[in-house]
């Protein structure tokens, strides 16, 4: 396969390919990217574990919204477990030293988190749409039964889309490094622009349209309810719901839009200019990918905040857990203080007694 590709590669293109360093920014990236992903790892893991603990403690009160949220939390936790290897990779200047098998697994976890997260956020918006706009069409029991089937379907769909990553090599030996899960590693894939454009439409554009339609309908319903019943507006329930909706949409757009826009515009450029793009264009795209992927991965840190502000029970439980932890720390400190003073007094008395014996 390599021989055939070499036959179709002109000498000028080959020299351009070899002279183009797409990782020239590694000196800056090896500082900023590990720092960013370390923050994502800590906040994402702690926040999502807290959310999972609260959900497990309230499993008897589970509903369709909680079910989708649980799967979203599991997806985020799964992603954070793969971050230490990525942090090491970026800290070494885009050099993967632990084999292609682990590289493939990391890539699998990354894409599972990305598109499982998008799908479950879409499911949440549809679920809220039926709960608020059409509450009589599906009762609570039916929504839970459907939610279980939908969650299973989403995981099967995402695994089906990402499992081919385990078949294809994800790492590539460069002159100075071994890269992992980088775009140039599979740039020669046949019909890649069309594959990525299709993935962007199914994995981003379609979910975004569904989310915007669902939440806009929910907002209209809330405004209509507020006009019919002024007490709901005075209670502040509608305002809180609207603020939560705005927050969810902003998080989705800010985290996922830049990455998919970067992919779409570069793939369109490749289709319009089938030949090898200039090195500066390719390098700019590579930098934009690293930046937008960092932004997209930050989404797993924002999900716990959505639960915190949107779910009254979750907020109350978290605050209760934190208060309990603080009270335990204070009580242990108070208990240890007299013990410390008593121990110091005993040691002082022993020293005095020892000196008096020596004096004799």
Curated annotation (Swiss-Prot):
Predominant subcellular localization, coarse grouping: membrane
Keyword tags: Adaptive immunity, Cell membrane, Disulfide bond, G-protein coupled receptor, Glycoprotein, Immunity, Membrane, Phosphoprotein, Receptor, Transducer, Transmembrane, Transmembrane helix
GO biological process: adaptive immune response; B cell activation involved in immune response; dendritic cell chemotaxis; dendritic cell homeostasis; G protein-coupled receptor signaling pathway; humoral immune response; leukocyte chemotaxis; mature B cell differentiation involved in immune response
Bilayer topology term: Multi-pass membrane protein
Transmembrane segment boundaries: 31-56, 77-94, 105-126, 149-167, 192-214, 241-264, 287-311
Parts of the chain on the Cytoplasmic side: 57-76, 127-148, 215-240, 312-360
Residue positions with a glycan: 7
Modified residues (Phosphoserine): 327
SS bond partners: 103-180
Record GO terms (molecular function): G protein-coupled receptor activity; oxysterol binding
Subunit annotation: Homodimer and heterodimer. Heterodimerizes with CXCR5; leading to modulate the interaction between of CXCL13 and CXCR5.
Function: G-protein coupled receptor expressed in lymphocytes that acts as a chemotactic receptor for B-cells, T-cells, splenic dendritic cells, monocytes/macrophages and astrocytes. Receptor for oxysterol 7-alpha,25-dihydroxycholesterol (7-alpha,25-OHC) and other related oxysterols. Mediates cell positioning and movement of a number of cells by binding the 7-alpha,25-OHC ligand that forms a chemotactic gradient. Binding of 7-alpha,25-OHC mediates the correct localization of B-cells during humoral immune responses.
Annotated family: Belongs to the G-protein coupled receptor 1 family.
Name assigned to this protein: G-protein coupled receptor 183
Species assigned in the record: Bos taurus (Bovine)
Gene transcribed to yield this protein: GPR183
């Amino acid at each position: 396969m390599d021989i055939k590709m070499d036959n179709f590669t002109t000498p000028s293109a080959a020299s351009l390919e070899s002279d183009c360093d797409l990782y020239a920014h590694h000196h800056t990236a090896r500082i900023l990217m590990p720092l960013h992903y370390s923050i994502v790892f800590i906040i994402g893991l702690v926040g999502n574990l807290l959310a999972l603990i609260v959900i497990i403690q309230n499993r008897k009160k589970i509903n369709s919204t909680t079910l989708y949220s649980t799967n979203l939390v599991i997806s985020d936790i799964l992603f954070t477990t793969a971050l230490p290897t990525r942090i090491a990779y970026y800290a070494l200047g885009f050099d993967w030293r632990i084999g292609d098998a682990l590289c493939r697994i990391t890539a699998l976890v990354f894409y599972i988190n990305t598109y499982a997260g998008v799908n479950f956020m879409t499911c949440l918006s549809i679920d809220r749409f039926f709960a608020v706009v059409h509450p009589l069409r599906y009762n609570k029991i039916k929504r839970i039964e459907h939610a279980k089937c939908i969650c299973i379907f989403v995981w099967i769909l995402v695994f089906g889309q990402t499992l081919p990553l385990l078949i294809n090599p994800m790492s590539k030996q460069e002159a100075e490094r071994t890269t992992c899960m980088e775009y140039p590693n599979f740039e020669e894939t046949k019909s890649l622009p069309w594959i990525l454009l299709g993935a962007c439409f199914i994995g981003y554009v379609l979910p975004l349209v569904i989310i915007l339609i669902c939440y806009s309908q929910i907002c209209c319903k809330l405004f209509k309810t507020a006009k019919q019943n002024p007490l709901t507006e005075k209670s502040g329930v509608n305002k809180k719901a609207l603020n939560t909706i705005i927050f969810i949409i902003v998080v989705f757009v800010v985290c996922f839009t830049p990455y998919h826009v970067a992919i779409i515009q570069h793939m369109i450029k490749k289709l319009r200019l089938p030949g090898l793009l200039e090195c500066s264009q390719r390098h700019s795209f590579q930098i934009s990918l690293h930046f937008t992927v960092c932004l997209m991965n930050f989404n797993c840190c924002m999900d716990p905040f959505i639960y915190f502000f949107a779910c009254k029970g979750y907020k109350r439980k978290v605050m209760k857990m934190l208060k309990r932890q603080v009270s335990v720390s204070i009580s242990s400190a108070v208990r240890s203080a007299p013990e410390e003073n008593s121990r110091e007094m005993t040691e002082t008395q022993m020293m005095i007694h020892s000196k008096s014996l020596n004096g004799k």
